[in-house]
Amino acid sequence: MYPFIKSIHSYFAWAALALIIIAIISTILTKNKESVSYKKWAFFGLMAVHIQLLIGLTLYFLSPFGLDNLSGDSMKDSFTRLLAVEHPFTNIVAIILITIGYSQSKKAEYGSKKILVFYTIGLILLLSRVPWSTWLS
């Protein structure tokens, strides 16, 4: 079960990141303030990161790198700490920021600015804590 969910988490991450990047680009390219295309991409990106979060939380509780590694000894190893603490915490914060950006954009007169700022910060946070050594192998 663990390898299957790990594969889903790894492959779906590409889709989630792509949708966030497309949302940011479509927001930048939006010239007409009344256009709704950037909002659609922002919504798809929002849904993708939330699905990725659910898959990731499932993986966290099934993984040998999850709750079992919250002891003092595992915190000394940078890779184990990345998987057990830094990756989940930072990604949850990034998803919260993306959610805030989408929700604020619905209330703002020019929502594209909110999406641009919050989605970009969220993307930077997501990319900063990807375990690149295992993800690309």
Where do the PLM segments sit?
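Membrane-embedded alpha-helical bundles that constitute the cytochrome b-like, heme-associated redox core
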Residues: M1-S137
